[in-house]
């Protein structure tokens, strides 16, 4: 932010490490890679910075499963129409919550179903195909998905 380092992360590449990522203890209410975001084009929200780097275009890592207040405000106030939510399979409840909120804000929302792998694991080509084949979620489908989790 303003030319200053505001976040970093480390990753182990060992097979089945106990701790895969190491993140600093600091506020996550930032917009990572903000300099590279086109707020007029579709956004892709993912969990981590390595996922965002794999996705390459207009991807914002949430640094977890939740959308922080600063980012949420920026999305709602922006002219962006389409938002793809690509959280890991274990974060489906949070993903549906984000879908519902953004739908209520008048955004066109797409829930990208990752089939057990995160974007970094599946790679750019596979993830791009998933995006291309994802349809917008509507209130009815959202409700069906929420009920299926009960």
PLM regions with names:
Residues 2, 45, 76, 81-86, ...:
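Replication-associated primase and helicase/ATPase modules
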Residues 54, 93-95:
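Extracytoplasmic/secreted cell-surface and envelope-processing proteins
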